[in-house]
Amino acid sequence: MLRLELHRENLMRRTIVGFAILIIICAGVRSVRAGDKIDVPKVITKSDVEKIVGAPVKDPKGRNKNGTDGYYESEWSYRSIEGNAGIYFDVLYAGQGAPAHLTRTMFSMLPADKSKSTPVDGLGDKAIFCPNETGMAMLHVLKGDILITIGFHGQAPKTVLDSEKSLATKILASL
């Protein structure tokens, strides 16, 4: 009888300890996933942009936003102090509450102004370069459920693709 009670106590203790460990692991995974979201200015610095633009730029303006529909977006821009050069970034994560294949559907509808696009190899799952979309040279990269958009204004579209690819590579490496 005593042996049965000790066995029950041990079983109960092991169950509680196992459950506590499971909760700790789940909480850790959740915090890693929540902390994994990109903050563009921490990855692409003002100094990085100044090297590409070739001139001093203003501090970044933008936001990081958790959407109510299960998405996260880091949307930032850097503008030159003089002239009209600037670089725009938008990194969109489709969250668990987002419609299935949201970012893939969005990517398939690009470029937004229906101008000509060129596929770009070696970036994410798919990438396209849109040299004249909305007055900017835009690079769109799809990686899983993440859509990255980089827009460059103020220089000839032919000259910015390599810079945009370099910036996209840096963002992809931080995901």
Q: Which ranges hold each PLM region?
A:
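A short, solvent-exposed beta-edge/loop patch
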Residues: A34-D36, P41, K46, E50, ...
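Hydrophobic alpha-helical segments, especially transmembrane helices
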Residues: R14-T15, S31, G122
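Bacterial N-terminal signal peptides
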Residues: G18-A27
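Bacterial Sec-dependent signal peptides at the C-terminal "C-region" and cleavage site
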Residues: C26-G35
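Short, solvent-exposed recognition patches
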Residues: K51-C130
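Bacterial N-terminal signal peptides that target proteins for export
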Residues: L4-F19
